[in-house]
Amino acid sequence: MDVVPCLKVPQRHAQMYRKYLESQGVLDRRYGAEKHSDGTVTLLVVASALPQLDLVALKEHVAHDSFCEIVDIQAQLSKKSKVKSVHMKLVEAARSFLLSKGKEWSEDLGRDIPGRWQCHGDLVLFTEGCFSNAVWKEIGSEFWTAVALTLGVKRIAQIKKISQDGYRTPIVTMLLGDSSHVTHIDNHIRYEFDVTKCMFSSGNITEKLRIASFDCSGETVVDLYAGIGYFTLPYLVHANAAHVHACEWNPDAVAALQRNLEINGVSNRCTVHQGDNRQLSLSDLADRVNLGLIPSSEEGWPVACRLLKRSTGGIMHIHQNVTAPFHHEPSELNSSVEGSSVEVSPLRIQKDMQVWTAWASETAKRICTLLLGITGSEWKTNIRHIEHVKTYAPHISHVVLDLECKPL
């Protein structure tokens, strides 16, 4: 392990510090953040940036009620760096296995080996588009045993495609092992589900961490697209919401959600509503509505407007895949826009942010119109924050709009 300079911050503010350092181009991404027993987290900083790092200004900009200091620690390579080395081990294992069976190796086969995958306990889930060459089927199950040994797991599965059944049910093939039930622990929350019946959105980890940092004490939250509890559970376990109404129409996801509420000890603070959320009979009770559906949650906007408290209003967290001009370069960092100001990262994501802000402004106007039509009174909307979750393609970004809605 290397001794490297890092920024020591409180764990509850670590995500905000990480995102800011990343946006300024001074986060050393070769190393992962480390949690410590004293409730702090260390974030690795590029050594050349240390002389220009103003800790007082940094604290005031990110979280004025926190603390930060520079310390030296022995740091391990980040998961991303480790995955690269594991990928090379996987390529070498596949090559050695094929050669041992008298098969020829080629660069095309090397490109057929995935560089990314999901881990759920002792099960690895590969996505579609890899191991597509016919040779992998020809060499049989012994090959998957070798892959499992290389990755340190016992079971292997692969998503072939996503069903168009309205539930986004994954079509998954078990390549090694019989049971498809898994346990996934994410930010101290335990999720149990069947990989052949339910999706797990591992790419949404930054949004789940952001929700976990909210203070929802005393609030009633409605999660319109709950799934197995991706966002419902962070609201309950970490954000301390008084009560969450979780809506989900996939029966398999509902079963997993109810199980996950039980095993995390929060079922007494959650009401599960199975079925189409557009038929939900609730109204005038929510301080916060989560609309976590992509590519668009637009069908849920009228429902969310009906759910907000008429007397005090509340906040909508509106997910959307926003398309930027195709020629524009992809954004590589999670980024944010707050109020009317645009924060520009070193990776030139300003044009993306302009597109997100334009979408958010139009959405805010439409929500105002919907609220007027549903409640019969005027409302004011305020763009509190735009969160960039991830980029799917060079021109498609998953963003979340935090929209404050207040009656006039």
Curated annotation (Swiss-Prot):
Pfam families, sorted: TRM5-TYW2_MTfase, TYW2_N, TYW2_N_2
Binding positions (S-adenosyl-L-methionine): 201, 208, 248, 276-277
Key words of the record: S-adenosyl-L-methionine, Transferase, tRNA processing
Record-level GO BP terms: tRNA methylation; wybutosine biosynthetic process
Reactions this protein catalyses: 4-demethylwyosine(37) in tRNA(Phe) + S-adenosyl-L-methionine = 4-demethyl-7-[(3S)-3-amino-3-carboxypropyl]wyosine(37) in tRNA(Phe) + S-methyl-5'-thioadenosine + H(+)
Gene Ontology CC: cytoplasm
SUPFAM superfamilies, A to Z: S-adenosyl-L-methionine-dependent methyltransferases
Disulfide pairings: none
GO molecular function: tRNA 4-demethylwyosine alpha-amino-alpha-carboxypropyltransferase activity; tRNA methyltransferase activity
EC number(s) from the headed UniProt entry: 2.5.1.114
Domain of life: Eukaryota
Pathway assigned in UniProt: tRNA modification; wybutosine-tRNA(Phe) biosynthesis
KW Disulfide bond (keyword) present: no
Keyword Phosphoprotein: no
Similarity comment: family membership: Belongs to the class I-like SAM-binding methyltransferase superfamily. TRM5/TYW2 family.
Task of the protein: S-adenosyl-L-methionine-dependent transferase that acts as a component of the wybutosine biosynthesis pathway. Wybutosine is a hyper modified guanosine with a tricyclic base found at the 3'-position adjacent to the anticodon of eukaryotic phenylalanine tRNA.
Name of protein: tRNA wybutosine-synthesizing protein 2 homolog
Gene responsible for this protein: trmt12
